[in-house]
Amino acid sequence: MLELKGKYGKDCKVFIDNVEEAALSTIYSILDDEVSANVPVRIMPDTHEGVDIVIGFTMPISDRVNPNHIGVDIGCGVTCGRIPKMSMSLAEIDERIRAAIPMGFAHRSSLHPFASENSAMEALATKIGQDPQNVYRQLGTLGGGNHFIEIGEADGDWYIFIHTGSRNFGLQVCKYHAAKAKANGSKYLFGNDM
């Protein structure tokens, strides 16, 4: 584990011993910004360079936020759950998952059923200049990169692991708010703009 200090950020822990230079430089740039003063900064072991921030970065915020620190993959995370054993093999389950869930750049040909229940998402998509229908066709799909669905067995039980993401929608939300901050002459949003 590394413990780092910058001009303002004095309580930073990186939960790995070796960090690539570009990521380390980005971490120090945040520790040298007053946004990191008097708050704990924690960096997860899978850290690597992102946009204005490293992946795996966590820090409480109060009076300001940099949209790029929230990131372009809003909702990204990993979840795990135990599932009932099925009569089919893991290979058959994998085949069914691949048939049912669009992956990579693919999306649904019809709207996800959630579309009829969520006017808030439609309003947000419209606000940031995105076609809500396109957003709804991406719901319940699996992006590319390091996103995955995995079924495994441990101690006689079956588990499903899913690394989720927001697809292009998260990128567009971030771009909208970053442009708003830039229009205000800052990289941060303050108060009601957050």
Q: Where in the sequence are the language-model features?
A:
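Hydrophobic residues embedded in beta-strands of well-ordered beta-sheets
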Residues: 158-159
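A short acidic (Asp/Glu
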Residues: 54
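Positively charged, aromatic-enriched nucleic acid-contacting surfaces
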Residues: 50
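Glycine-rich, flexible loop motifs
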Residues: 1-41, 47, 57, 61-69, ...
